Amino acid sequence: MAVHAHPDDESSKGAASAARYVAEGVEVLVVTCTGGERGDVLNPGLAHDPAVLADLAAYRRTEMARAAEILGVQQTWLGFHDSGLPEADEEGVVPPLPEGCFALVPLDEATEPLVRLVREFRPHVMTTYDENGGYPHPDHIKTHEISMRAFEAAGDASQFPGTGEPWQPAKLYYHLTFHKARLVALHEACLAEGIESPFAEWLEGWEDKPEDAARLTTRVPCADWFATRDEALKAHATQIDPDGRWFHVPLETQREAWPTEDFQLARSLVPVGEGIEDDLFAGVRPDTATTDVSRSA
């Protein structure tokens, strides 16, 4: 079960590994917390399209359905409203979040439908964002909060009664999409091939934090699904500039420089070995697990 804030997040974070697991027979459910109603239209070709501007939420639901089809995942909505990303004015004053938005919903109220889904789908592995939301968008931070709360509560019959039989996932991971080691590897690969690196400016302003080095616990090989990832991302046409520089790095360059998607193991109720994992189901697979379970995520 991959818990995301907005439609398109599932295609920019963990998409290739999700597609790989689907190809291996794993059931993967993407949970999208909001409809992305307050997102901007980032594709210049659609920025003034009347059909898009008339009902962005409906347009993004169509995009999400297409991306899910490409990845092969199941997908459902929690039904909350996008909080938007407030920007400070010239005096540095940040406007309040809009009333009724996802970020302002009380924690247990926002968590209840996710607990219901966990108990219904019965995943063995969950993925979500870290405590910073991956980046400090209020909906991403809220997604982290409800994911952690649901992971801890779903197996406890005394919590959230009336939402199904208790079910305890075995592991929970944070996405580590944009960490320094990966960006450096891709940046250096671009330079070696004479390609303009889209990561140069990002790395110049990078602030190293000692604790970040320990975050990388799991690298899932999934290079064969990078093209699927990009196709799913481009399905979110309002959110992606198809001519953007991110798509200028050849897939083969990416595959050779960094052939994995990466995660941080945040919670585990199964034994964890030493070193870097190469499978989200390490310790949960029938051949290594303490209990014989089928695989779902």
Regions found by a protein language model. Give the residues of each.
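Metal-dependent de-N-acetylase/amidase catalytic core
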Residues: 1-3, 88-297
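Active-site rim/loop-helix segments in enzyme catalytic domains that contact anionic ligands
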Residues: 1-122, 264-267, 272-273
